[in-house]
């Protein structure tokens, strides 16, 4: 987990060296009408590492803003419009160079719109959603919360790479096979 501004900048520097990352956010749920909480957590994943930015602790999204506004790293996520809107409540951001998986997946004939369903369809495995409504502003995130949060961002990256036809980790190669559609992602990258 990334809990300080210095840690956030160090993580951002590393992430901006990646060609593509998965991204997601978590917000403390509100069970009362009219109450909205700010984004508490931003998850950004590479193939093997997921950074969990505790925005509710850092109180500054400048490092996240650098990543989102970068044109050198492709950001991949699902329902990014909602994630970006939540982050804009904290600071003005203009995201560049990203792919919305809901739109991208439709180019491959996938009609499912939830991350859990798209992932299960492609990989034959389920993503647990039991932590979705937990308190993301808690002083410490539980291991279950951290795993849930990291999995969502990581899954976005894996779905994108699988649809694009890029090599997957060994355990997925036998499960997923798709006709490759070279260059199709260019139509979906938001500048």
Region locations from a protein language model:
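Short acidic, Gly/Ser-rich segments with clustered Asp/Glu that frequently serve as metal-coordination loops
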Residues: 20-33
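Short active-site oxyanion
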Residues: 70-75
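N-terminal accessory regions of nucleic-acid-interacting proteins
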Residues: 1-21, 90, 101, 154, ...
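A short alpha/beta connector and helix-capping loop motif
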Residues: 31-48
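Short active-site loop/helix that positions an aromatic residue
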Residues: 30-31, 83-90
């Amino acid at each position: 987990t990334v809990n300080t501004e210095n840690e956030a900048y160090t993580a951002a520097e590393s992430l901006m060296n990646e060609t593509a990352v998965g991204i997601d956010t978590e917000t403390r749920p509100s069970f009362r009408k009219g109450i909205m909480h700010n984004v508490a957590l931003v998850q950004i994943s590479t193939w093997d590492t997921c950074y969990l930015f505790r925005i509710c602790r850092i109180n500054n999204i400048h490092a996240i803003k650098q990543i989102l506004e970068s044109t050198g790293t492709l950001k991949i996520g699902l329902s990014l419009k909602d994630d970006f809107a939540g982050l804009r409540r904290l600071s003005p951001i203009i995201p560049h160079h990203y792919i919305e998986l809901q739109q991208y997946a439709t180019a491959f004939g996938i009609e499912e719109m939830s991350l859990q369903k798209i992932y299960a369809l492609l990989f034959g495995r389920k993503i647990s959603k039991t932590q979705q409504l937990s308190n993301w502003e808690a002083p410490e995130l539980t291991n279950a919360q951290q795993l849930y949060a990291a999995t969502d961002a990581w899954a976005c990256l894996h779905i994108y790479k699988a649809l694009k036809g890029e090599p997957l980790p060994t355990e997925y190669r036998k499960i997923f096979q798709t006709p490759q559609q070279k260059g199709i992602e260019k139509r979906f990258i938001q500048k």
